[in-house]
Amino acid sequence: MAAAVEKILGEQYYKDAMEQCHNYNARLCAERSVRLPFLDSQTRVAQSNCYIWMEKRHRGPGSAPGQLYTYPSRRWRKKRRAHPPEDPRLSFPSLKPDPEQMLKKEGVIPPDGSSLEALLRSDPIEKRIMPDSRDDDSLTEFPPLSRSARKRILEPDDFLDDLDDEDYEEDTPKKRGKGKAKGKGIGSARKKLDAAALDDRDKPYACDICGKRYKNRPGLSYHYAHSHLVDEEGAGAEDKEDSQPPTPIMHRPEEQKSKKGPDGIALPNNYCDFCLGDSKINKKTNQSEELVSCSDCGRSGHPSCLQFTAVMMAAVKTYRWQCIECKCCNICGTSENDDQLLFCDDCDRGYHMYCLVPPVAEPPEGSWSCHLCLDLLKDKASIYQNQS
């Protein structure tokens, strides 16, 4: 192919083209070596400085069978970094300066007067302030650097050493060990912060008395009603005897603001949350109907609006009934994992599926009755009615 091109274009033209191509490649490689490391726009690879480019004079005879040439290996070594010269004005002063020289420098003691007279005439120390940073004297430029120092600062290899040594080259084992130790400490602290933030995000409702956190408001309401209600009522009775009124708690959830009766049950609302009727009339059926009230939040509803059966209506009068938003497990007493709650079709109590004995993996199809209703109703429980 090269012979055909040389025959068509001529020998001299071909030699000139090859020389220009060689010069172009040499300039390109030299320019790339100056700005190493760089990101290759074609391969998207960060090219770092290396020694794979060899000259013809570096060739040696092959040492293995079938090997034409060998090139000398070069051991990697870390380059020395050239630091810019320090400004003498940035150096620290001596530990024991002469007090008289410092006073002369600040202008308190004139050079031709006595020290005692100058101290008597001078202003108090509080009135002596530092010179304004905007003065022309404080903005004097740094002294010009020498040619060799400027060359050392502007040398591109010095700036490339940082990237070569730390990002693209192997580091010494000693330095690598220090880096791992630092990273481990920072990572563990960061993991603790992330775990705390994740816990706050998963359980946004916190008790303002003990600080315990819950995933939803019903759990917080149940915790407050069963853990702090008795203590709060006892403290309120003692505070009535004192002359000073108790300090009100400003930031309290809505469920905690509901008024409680003497037995700890929330005062019931006199209207239905579904049809907005009262005990005298149900606006859906236009008939009078007794209201069922939640013992935690006081919300009320008609049995027909709640789709209660006659058995369920009789059962809710025997215990502290809770609405769907305040419902908690009858075994563990918490409202966490409310998606795992299973409700009895005879008494409307709630149970976690994993709290049952034996645990239930999936909710059963049809009606389900708890162990209390099975012992009380026997074969009249809803679970047997559904099977029949």
UniProtKB/Swiss-Prot annotation:
Gene3D superfamilies: Zinc/RING finger domain, C3HC4 (zinc finger)
Main location as per UniProt: cytoplasm
Zinc finger (PHD-type) in chain: 269-329, 326-376
Gene Ontology molecular-function annotations: zinc ion binding
Start and end residues of each stretch annotated as Disordered: 60-190, 233-264
TM region(s), chain numbering: none
Any single GO CC term annotated in Swiss-Prot or TrEMBL for this entry: cytoplasm
Biased composition (Acidic residues): 156-170
Keyword field contains Cytoplasm: yes
Ranges in coiled-coil conformation: none
GO biological process: apoptotic process; nervous system development
InterPro entries per the UniProt record, alphabetical: DPF1-3_N (IPR025750), Znf_C2H2_sf (IPR036236), Znf_C2H2_type (IPR013087), Znf_FYVE_PHD (IPR011011), Znf_PHD (IPR001965), Znf_PHD-finger (IPR019787), Znf_RING/FYVE/PHD (IPR013083)
Family matches, as Pfam families: DPF1-3_N (PF14051), PHD (PF00628)
Annotated function: May be a transcription factor required for the apoptosis response following survival factor withdrawal from myeloid cells. Might also have a role in the development and maturation of lymphoid cells.
UniProt name for this protein: Zinc finger protein ubi-d4 A
Organism: Xenopus laevis
Gene: req-a
